[in-house]
């Protein structure tokens, strides 16, 4: 997968632009607030159709009614154009001019590494669960469909609980058990390989403590129906479904202890990087080509080992876009970011300084 070019219009603080990207590493540098993160966010949206903002209006430039991003892609010798239009709380996706759903876009097209990924370790169970569900939904269209049906069923069952409709519970319970059991079994199977890859990456990052991923499940496929019945009175009182895969957690054991409770900040950053590399490798195994790698702020709070790991990872994929307040070494193209605009930098700043000093 290669991003040939990215176009944006009225997207956050970005000036209207069309940027071309070569194979290899593109480095984007500039001060904080210059638009570097927004550029990666736009690229990820155009490549995957996905965003984690709660309101789409947040992506539209202040004073404008609509925003637009477009990615020109090459994959397996074929060219395609993916477009995302944003406006009035709606997202419209097109591939080669034909409207599609997010699930119709290439699911293995991009991985985005961000400084806030440490929250996968230290944040809430819902954040870790969302990470796992998002990854598995990209690996399997069927998982994405089952998860969407399960979420709808939970919402409908919760409404029935709040209305005191105990007589209808057996209908919702049967649906939850079927859908939820499928989700739990798929998670277990996928987690075996994800844990292997994350452990390898954790070791490559220099950690002396083994990393093991697991699941903290509120129920099991074998006991799900019984657990729903046994907690019926509690659920009617609280008006929500208390057990099921929507309550589970992705666990991370570092050495002999839960990472969420005992890992240092540095160890947390290592685990987060290991998870993202595992994500990249899983997508590559599933779809037969490595995704475009997007790395935001490659030097942020990272020691030399983790920083070198990120840069080596960027160099190992066919294409990566790496941002930072300083230039990324070894980039095939370097762009300077300033006030939402991006201009090619002819040579590293350090080289220019050296030339100036010699001339002086």
From Swiss-Prot:
GO terms for biological process: DNA replication; DNA synthesis involved in DNA repair; double-strand break repair; SOS response. ATP binds at residues 30-37. It is found in: Cytoplasm. The keyword Ribosomal protein does not apply. It comes from the Bacteria. NCBIfam families: PRK14079.1, recf. GO terms for molecular function: ATP binding; single-stranded DNA binding. The RecF protein is involved in DNA metabolism; it is required for DNA replication and normal SOS inducibility. RecF binds preferentially to single-stranded, linear DNA. It also seems to bind ATP. Belongs to the RecF family. This is DNA replication and repair protein RecF. PANTHER family: DNA REPLICATION AND REPAIR PROTEIN RECF. GO terms for cellular component: cytoplasm. It comes from Deinococcus deserti (strain DSM 17065 / CIP 109153 / LMG 22923 / VCD115). InterPro entries: DNA-binding_RecF (IPR001238), DNA-binding_RecF_CS (IPR018078), P-loop_NTPase (IPR027417), RecF/RecN/SMC_N (IPR003395), RecF_2 (IPR042174). Keywords: ATP-binding, Cytoplasm, DNA damage, DNA repair, DNA replication, DNA-binding, Nucleotide-binding, SOS response. The gene is recF. It holds the Pfam family SMC_N. Its main location: cytoplasm.
């Amino acid at each position: 997968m290669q991003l040939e070019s990215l176009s944006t219009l009225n997207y956050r603080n970005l000036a209207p632009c069309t940027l071309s990207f070569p194979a290899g590493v593109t480095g984007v540098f500039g001060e904080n607030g210059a638009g570097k993160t927004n550029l990666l966010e736009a690229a990820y949206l155009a490549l995957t159709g996905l965003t984690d903002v709660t309101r789409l209006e947040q992506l539209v430039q202040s004073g404008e009614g609509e925003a637009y991003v477009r990615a020109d892609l090459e994959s397996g010798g074929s060219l395609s154009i993916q477009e995302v239009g944003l406006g009035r709380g709606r997202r419209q996706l097109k591939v080669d001019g034909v409207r599609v759903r997010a699930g119709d876009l290439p699911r293995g097209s991009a991985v985005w590494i961000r400084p806030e990924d440490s929250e996968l370790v230290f944040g809430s169970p819902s954040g870790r669960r969302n990470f796992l569900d998002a990854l598995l939904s990209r690996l399997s269209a069927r998982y994405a469909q089952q998860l969407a049906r399960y979420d709808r069923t939970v919402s409908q069952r919760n409404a029935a609980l709040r209305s005191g409709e105990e007589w209808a519970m057996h209908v919702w319970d049967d649906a939850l058990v079927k859908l939820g059991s499928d989700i739990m079994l798929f998670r277990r199977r996928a987690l075996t390989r994800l844990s292997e890859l994350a452990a390898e990456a954790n070791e490559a990052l220099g950690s002396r403590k083994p990393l093991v991923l697991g699941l903290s499940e509120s129920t099991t496929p074998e006991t799900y129906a019984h657990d729903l019945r046994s907690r019926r009175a509690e659920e009617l009182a609280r008006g929500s479904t208390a057990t099921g895969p929507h309550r589970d957690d992705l666990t991370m054991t570092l050495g002999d202890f839960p990472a969420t409770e005992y890992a240092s900040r540095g160890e947390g950053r290592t685990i987060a990087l290991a998870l993202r590399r595992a994500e990249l490798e899983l997508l590559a195994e599933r779809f037969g080509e490595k995704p475009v790698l997007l790395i935001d702020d490659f030097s942020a709070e990272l020691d030399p080992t983790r920083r070198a790991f990120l840069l080596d990872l960027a160099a190992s994929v066919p294409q990566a876009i790496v941002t930072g307040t300083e230039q990324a070494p070894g980039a095939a193209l370097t762009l300077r970011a300033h006030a939402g605009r991006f201009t090619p930098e002819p040579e590293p700043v350090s080289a220019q300084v050296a030339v100036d000093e010699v001339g002086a």
